[in-house]
Amino acid sequence: MKLPVRLAVWLILTVSAVLAVSAVAEDSIRLWNFDGDPPGALPKTFVVGTLVDGRPAGEWKVLKTDRAKSPPQVLAQLMGKGFEHAYKVVLIDGTTSSDLDLQVSFLPIEGKADMGGGLIWRADDDRNYYLTRANPLEQNIRIYRVVKGIRHLLQNFDQTIHLNRWHTLHVVNRGCQIQVLYDEKPVFDLCDQTFTTGLIGLWTKSDAVTYFDDLRLQILK
């Protein structure tokens, strides 16, 4: 049975539109599970920041470990020493975005002065960005704006954070509205207009050693 020409054209256009939308949606999502990266090296496009004394901001490298959330590898920050305000930052080139849905899993490994880690987004550079982080020593989650290397606390949320367990930080930022979830539990919902666009990245502090896995970025239209 032959379809009427108009109906056939409509079906073709509809299918094409659906495929185009699917392709755009897939293109707007980027995943890093670090399993295809050479162990002992930094993934391509990942750029380590600089500490105030000029040294690299951490020892970031891909690590093969049986503790990976999605085996066999993680991205690890392994520098287990640092002064109190040593922010270990790695940014990812080619991730400039404004509205986004961003998440990562992290595993606290060790640290006496500090533990845990965080997500960076809308970063101008390694000294200006938004940050949300979880700290098992303080048993809290916080969100900051970091301006010229100085943290400015936006909100705090007290939360039990178990050691030796993977956790997830999840950020959704549309316009000025920022929502943060910890293990998919909502913890922050606020508006801040300091930064409008920028790179994403990962963060630890002081002597915290942390593994990261399954980093996911979706750019929202």
For each predicted feature, which ranges?
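Bacterial N-terminal signal peptides
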Residues: A8-A20
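Beta-strand-rich interaction surfaces with strong enrichment in secreted/lumenal proteins
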Residues: Y87-G94, Q155-I161, L202
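Short tryptophan-centered beta-strand motifs in secreted/extracellular beta-sheet-rich domains
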Residues: F34, L102-V104, N164-V180
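Short, aromatic/His-centered strand-loop micro-motif at the edge of beta-sheets
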Residues: V147-T168
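Ligand-recognition surfaces built from glycine- and aromatic
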Residues: S28-N33, F195-K221
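Extracellular glycan-recognition surfaces and repeat-rich motifs
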Residues: A41-A76
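Short, solvent-exposed beta-strand-to-loop segments that form ligand-recognition rims
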Residues: D158, L181-G201
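Secretory/extracellular carbohydrate-interaction modules
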Residues: P39, P72, Q77-R142, V147
